[in-house]
């Protein structure tokens, strides 16, 4: 398993994909999959089934993991 320089809470810039150019905070690092979850990037709508907890069901927006190679540390952050 490789060691990554990007940690939870770091400010990163997306360098590839639909969110290219965005600067945001890392919410979670998934080292085994070499992926990160970045706040407000790669957002998808997930369907929620009807249940006791959620009687109406519906949709929820959620950030999905992206490859760690698609982000770099933002300039000026150490």
UniProtKB/Swiss-Prot annotation:
Q: Which UniProt keywords apply?
A: Ribonucleoprotein, Ribosomal protein, RNA-binding, rRNA-binding
Q: Name one GO biological process term.
A: translation
Q: Name one GO molecular function term.
A: structural constituent of ribosome
The protein's superkingdom reads Bacteria
- What GO cellular component term, any one, is given? ribosome
Q: Which InterPro entries match?
A: KOW, Rib_uL2_dom2, Ribosomal_uL24, Ribosomal_uL24_CS, Ribosomal_uL24_KOW, Translation_prot_SH3-like_sf
Functionally, this protein is described as follows: One of two assembly initiator proteins, it binds directly to the 5'-end of the 23S rRNA, where it nucleates assembly of the 50S subunit.
Note the subunit structure: Part of the 50S ribosomal subunit.
Q: Which PANTHER family match?
A: MITOCHONDRIAL RIBOSOMAL PROTEIN L24
The text of the family note is: Belongs to the universal ribosomal protein uL24 family.
Name of the molecule in the record: Large ribosomal subunit protein uL24
Q: Which organism is it from?
A: Helicobacter hepaticus (strain ATCC 51449 / 3B1)
Task: Kindly list the organism's lineage.
Answer: Bacteria, Pseudomonadati, Campylobacterota, Epsilonproteobacteria, Campylobacterales
Gene name as annotated: rplX
């Amino acid at each position: 398993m490789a060691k990554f320089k990007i940690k939870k809470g770091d400010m990163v810039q997306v360098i590839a994909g639909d969110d290219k150019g965005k600067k945001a905070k890392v919410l979670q690092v998934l080292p085994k999959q070499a992926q990160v979850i970045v706040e407000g990037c790669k957002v998808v709508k997930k369907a929620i089934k009807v249940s006791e907890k959620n009687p109406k069901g519906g949709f929820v927006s959620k950030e999905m993991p992206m490859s760690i190679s698609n982000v770099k540390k933002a300039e000026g952050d150490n």
